[in-house]
Amino acid sequence: MARHTQLRNNRRRGQRTSTLVALTVLLIPILAQDNKRGFAYVGDANEADNNMLTSSRTPLKWYYNWAPSPPPQVPSKNLEFVPLIHGLDEASSDSTSRQLSALPDSSTHLLSFNEPDGTTKSGGSSISPEDAAKAYIEHVAKFRDGSSGGRKWKISHPSVTGSGNGLEWLKSFNASCYDIDSENGCPTDFVAAHWYGAFDGLASWLGTLDEFYNTNGSREGDDRLKIWVTELALPQQDAQTTVQMMNSTLPYLDGLDYVERYAWFGAFREGDANEWTGDGVALFDDDGELTELGALYLGGEQNGFAVGQKGDGEGAAGQLLQLLVELDLKQVLR
């Protein structure tokens, strides 16, 4: 604080004005970012990587880890943690309710049933639509009305794979819900979606889900369900192709009114990528340096992130931005 006071006293009015203009120019791209962007945490044990992901200078505002409680490796003071009920066992477990009750008030949304139309080998929960509907009404809905989990949670419908099978599963799930409860079905607050593929396919899949939940369901205005894209990547492509896809995708999702949040699947090092996605989705190389994809997702040089930057060091742009943000603008203008 004393240093800032000295700076203010040593600056002339013209220099103060120049500082304000420079700060304004730097902050415009950051202020333009909303809170849609987050990441899926798959278990990166490198502290430097996690420090970069949780930096307040990134546009990242939330994260999840396919579990009802946050990982100890991720300091979450700058991020909202979003819990997930992965499968049937977690839905009916008293432990899940205790874990949710222990979360900070900043956690308000709850994801349910990860890829029930997928196999457990691929990370899915492998649940039939009928069993999922029964468990949803008996257990998951209780988190929504506050009778379990310590508060009233906003809950999602199950997040299926981005495929024809996923859509058919959702249709069967919805029908089963109304077979059990003809009046309410399986009430939900938002929709969770996954997409692995090219940009045009993503746009088509989101349009399909919006039509299924909103247009066909006659939802309008404030009643329209928002979509969260909780897994997103372009598998098995080279770095240049993947960067091109991300360059098209980020502004599209940021501008789409019915998409509320999204998370890239790639918050890890290239060597930690699975065989199916390939290492082109990774935000970090094996030395912990930001890939071109990683620098782009974290906001680029305008936010102080550059290709090759490591989490245990700060780029020049980042240092300048941090210094300017820490200045009390009201005092600078005096």
Which residues does each predicted region cover?
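Fungal secretory targeting signals
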Residues: 1-34, 314-334
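N-terminal carbohydrate-binding/catalytic regions of secreted carbohydrate-active enzymes
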Residues: 34-110, 124, 133-139
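Solvent-exposed loop/turn segments at secondary-structure junctions
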Residues: 44-47, 67-71, 86-91, 114-119, ...
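Acidic (Asp/Glu)-rich catalytic clusters
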Residues: 51-58, 70-81, 95-107, 141-150, ...
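Aromatic- and acid-rich polysaccharide-binding/catalytic face
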Residues: 65, 83, 114, 170-213, ...
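Aromatic-rich peripheral "rim/lid" segments of glycoside hydrolase catalytic domains that contact
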Residues: 80-83, 87, 258, 263-334
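Active-site groove signature of glycoside hydrolases
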Residues: 104-129, 153-164, 186-195, 228-229, ...
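Active-site clefts of carbohydrate-active enzymes
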Residues: 122, 157, 218-249, 265-284
